[in-house]
Amino acid sequence: MTKVLVLYYSTYGHIETMAEAVAEGVRAAGAQADIKRVPETVPEDVARTHHFKLDQAAPIATPADLEAYDAIIVGTPTRFGRMASQMASFWDQTGGLWMKGALIGKVGAAFTSTATQHGGQETTLFSVITNLLHQGMVISGLPYNFQGQMRLDEITGGAPYGATTIAAGDGSRAVSDNERDGARFLGQHVAQIAAKLSA
């Protein structure tokens, strides 16, 4: 069975919600989906003061976990147009995997959230994708046969480079149905590609 890791970091829960939708899509394709998160680096008292969502059920990932999967779908909120430092720190610890070529040929994809419609979604996705390319991974985006990213009747996330959501500056906007659909589509699409490549 094709194994897919949904690896994420979430501050207020938006990326956690997207990760769950991605995993639903993976499972719909008949693949195994494991959801793991990277460690929080913000001190707990600071995180509580700023209302971080600390009760996330997903187990903490280690870089060594990545080798076991056929595909890795990475989710992170934006920080000034790039991935959050927590996710960057995790990937900075994957030098040993790079030295062994352990991730070469695996499928990689990305999803993100931003505060606003033009808050750096695509640059954040590319900041993730760059790491995956350096590891030798085969990149998948969110193809345009997911028609939800073409909608003009509502403000919504979605890009050909990955699934996205808009959270609002204070995290008050919930992930929309359309954005969940995009995340599910991404998960299913990646799982289907990984199954073909590992056959």
UniProtKB/Swiss-Prot annotation:
Query: What Pfam families does this protein map onto?
Result: FMN_red
The positions annotated for binding FMN are 10-15, 78-80, 113-119, 134
Co-factor binding comment: Binds 1 FMN per monomer.
Keyword NAD appears in the UniProt entry: yes
EC number assigned by the record = 1.6.5.2
What positions does the entry give for NAD(+) binding?
Answer: 12
> Which ranges carry the Flavodoxin-like domain?
4-190
Q: Which residues bind substrate?
A: 98
Question: Which cofactor names does the annotation list?
Answer: FMN
SUPFAM superfamilies named in the record = Flavoproteins
Q: Name one GO cellular component term.
A: membrane
Q: Which InterPro entries match?
A: Flavodoxin/NO_synth, Flavoprotein-like_sf, Flavoprotein_WrbA-like, FMN_Rdtase-like_dom, NQO
Record keywords, A-Z: Flavoprotein, FMN, NAD, NADP, Nucleotide-binding, Oxidoreductase
Q: Which GO terms describe its molecular function?
A: flavin adenine dinucleotide binding; FMN binding; NAD binding; NADH:ubiquinone reductase (non-electrogenic) activity; NADP binding; NADPH dehydrogenase (quinone) activity
EC top class named in words: oxidoreductase
Q: Does the UniProt entry include the keyword Flavoprotein?
A: yes
Catalytic activity reads: a quinone + NADH + H(+) = a quinol + NAD(+); a quinone + NADPH + H(+) = a quinol + NADP(+)
State the similarity comment.
Answer: Belongs to the WrbA family.
Q: What is this protein called?
A: NAD(P)H dehydrogenase (quinone)
Give the organism the record lists: Gluconacetobacter diazotrophicus (strain ATCC 49037 / DSM 5601 / CCUG 37298 / CIP 103539 / LMG 7603 / PAl5)
